[in-house]
């Protein structure tokens, strides 16, 4: 198990870092927020032009043919710059499963436009009242060669702007269907929601929505397997983004405390401050190690259910502690919503809760351990 990045990966990350550093500046983010926006379409177009948006998609749909490892490294940089682009939501959670499980027609219909930055896709993985996204309450009833979907999905990123929404639903015989839903289809109602980070989301109500056979990504025979595949990658994608957020929040704290003086000395020299940041450093490195381990196993096609849950647990618990430590050592500046650290705090809180907070991950780890032979 080797976590060392190669030259190609370093070059990819370097390119992404350069673009994000130049375009996702605190000033630019403040301008977007002041204008009532969040998604930076111009930045996303630039990332697409550089081959970053489609890096993990297959070459025959305009992608770079790279793997989950490279995508996780890119997501870390998105988190480090709190960049308002849909790399996690569109590429990892929606385009990647279409690339993996879709027919030639399904793949060619939308993925070239995703790689080129011309289309947004999203996935509806969250439901109110259901802690486990692997067992959706939304139902899929057979209708000829297709299905009819009924249910309510919550916190769907970019729901109103997406070309297609990937929707998991349960059949009457405990099967799972992954369907591609047009947000403008009859029976679809989208109510605006706003995430902690400011990201536009939506509550998506499906009222007997017809899904033709050509829009069924995975049928009941392989649906549960495909949903597990998707959620494992979505969770490590969240963990990778959280790693970037926490790592940059820690770096900002180190810079601030070495420059801020009190009683004639930098406050970083005070034992209480140093210990707080040292604990945060340990949390960040634990987040890094567990995330890379889970990504490596998934990329190698090996079982990783426990490792994925451990990585997300560290993203939740470690990310929570780092966010609060960073805010604490910044003092009054740390709670100023106009100070850049505020975005890192809000992103951290959102990522902590995305697809299951720490207790949900512990439950999954415990369930796995309970079913393993002694």
Located regions from the model:
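Alpha-helical interface subdomain recognition
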Residues: 1-81, 101-104, 117, 142, ...
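N-terminal glycine-rich flavin-associated loop
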Residues: 85-105
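Short beta-strand-to-turn element immediately C-terminal to the catalytic PLP-Schiff-base lysine
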Residues: 99-102, 141, 167-170, 180-183, ...
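A generic local secondary-structure boundary/capping motif
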Residues: 110-112, 128-129, 137-139, 153-157, ...
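A short core secondary-structure module
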Residues: 124, 150-189
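Flexible, small-/acidic-enriched active-site or ligand-binding loops
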Residues: 135, 155-156, 182-218
């Amino acid at each position: 198990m080797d976590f060392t990045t190669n030259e190609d990966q370093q070059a990819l990350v370097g390119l992404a870092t350069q673009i994000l550093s130049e375009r996702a500046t605190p000033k630019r983010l403040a301008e977007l927020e002041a204008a009532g926006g969040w998604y930076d379409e111009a930045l996303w177009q630039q990332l697409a032009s550089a081959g970053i948006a489609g890096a993990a998609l297959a070459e025959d749909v305009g992608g770079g043919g790279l793997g989950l490892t490279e995508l996780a490294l890119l997501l870390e940089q998105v988190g480090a710059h709190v960049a308002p682009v849909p790399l996690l939501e569109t590429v990892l959670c929606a385009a990647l499963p279409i690339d993996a499980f879709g027919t030639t027609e399904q793949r060619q219909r939308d993925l070239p436009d995703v790689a080129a930055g011309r289309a947004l896709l999203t996935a509806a993985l969250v439901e109110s009242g259901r802690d486990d996204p692997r067992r959706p309450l939304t139902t899929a009833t057979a209708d000829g060669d297709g299905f009819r979907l009924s249910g309510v999905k919550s916190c769907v990123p970019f729901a109103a702007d997406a070309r297609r929404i990937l929707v998991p639903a349960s059949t009457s015989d405990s099967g799972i269907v992954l369907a591609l839903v047009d947000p403008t289809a009859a029976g679809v109602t989208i109510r605006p929601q706003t995430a902690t980070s400011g990201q536009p989301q939506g509550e998506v109500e499906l009222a007997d929505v017809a899904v033709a056979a050509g829009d069924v990504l995975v049928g009941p025979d392989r649906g549960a397997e495909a949903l597990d595949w998707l959620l494992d990658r979505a969770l490590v994608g969240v963990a990778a983004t959280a790693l970037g957020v926490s790592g940059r929040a820690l770096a900002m704290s180190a810079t601030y405390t070495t420059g801020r003086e009190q009683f004639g000395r930098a406050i970083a020299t005070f034992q209480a401050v140093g210990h707080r940041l040292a604990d945060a450093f340990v949390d960040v490195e634990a987040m890094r190690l567990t995330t890379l381990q889970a990504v490596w196993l998934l990329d190698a096609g090996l079982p990783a259910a426990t490792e994925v849950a451990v990585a997300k647990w560290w993203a939740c618990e470690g990310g929570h502690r780092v966010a609060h430590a960073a805010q604490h050592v910044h003092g009054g500046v740390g709670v100023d919503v106009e100070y850049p650290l505020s975005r890192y705090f809000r992103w951290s809180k959102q990522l902590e809760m995305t697809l299951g907070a720490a207790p949900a991950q512990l439950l999954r780890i415990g369930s796995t351990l309970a079913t393993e032979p002694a």
